[in-house]
Amino acid sequence: LHQHFVTNNDRRIISQDMNRKTIGYNHARTELSTSITAKWMPTERLGLSVTLREEMYGAQWTPLIPAFYADYLISKRGTIRAKASVSRNYRYPTLNDLYFQPGGNTDLVPESGFSYDGGISFAVGKEGVYSLHGEATWFDSYIDDWILWLPLGGNTNYWTPLNMKDVHAYGVELKAGYDRMLSKEWQLGLDGNFSWTPSVNRGEAFSKGDRSLGRQLPYVPVYSAAVTGRLAYKSWRLLYKWCYYSERFTMTSNAFTYTGNVPYYLMNDVTLEKLFSARWADFSVKAAVKNLFDEEYVSVLGRPMPGINFEI
């Protein structure tokens, strides 16, 4: 059982036009989540589980949200496992979705739908020497009333969330990791992931001239990848992270125009971390260089992201 109280009391002036001021919103709601899980192992290799979850947002309860999971050990050698799941999705709009100023939309309805996924994984290694693991997952989701923030256009310069009637999100995710003990004090690690995630509007057009049907959702990259390298010596950690994001369309029509798409970009980060241990606590100090090669890129059209920057 989980319960928390969500509130926003943002009273700052967001914009001012002549005699009109736009300020933040002041809304709150209680959110409650409860779930129950049953597990069963009919054989030594097969595991099954069912989860029933229900959530409350303010005074409204979601329908019962079930999920079914299956896990089968194909081979003990290599720890090869097959996994599959079927689950119902139900998501209420956030407070920002409803009330953000400017742009919030109080007419939004909750997202709902079903998701299916299946995959296979393996893990091999020698204790104290090395470990190698990998995973491939396929997923398929059908979501009604997908909440999507879009620019209004015209004389306005802000975004608003809308419900997209029917969205088909599917794809493949690949993950792999390798760890090696070079000595008692030195450790080397490498992790990588790749995603192919089309998200397509299969429902209704927003208007008579809307060309979004059968096209990728705006600002959702079809391809993304990341590689992280780690080198550890005693209590020191050095991390290098490389990320790739494919181009993203800025309009529901997926038009290939100067303003119709955001180019792909690469990102490189380096982090140095020192771990400390005391009687009363364990803590760490980090120093990071973000955007190491000072790439010029944007995640949202017309909003340049920071060049090389530093964090401590």
Describe each region flagged by the PLM.
Residues 1, 48-50, 66, 80-84, ...:
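Transmembrane beta-strands of outer-membrane beta-barrel proteins
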Residues 244-253, 263, 272-312:
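C-terminal beta-signal and adjacent terminal beta-strands/loops
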Residues 41-47, 137-142, 163-252, 293:
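Gram-negative outer-membrane beta-barrel transporters
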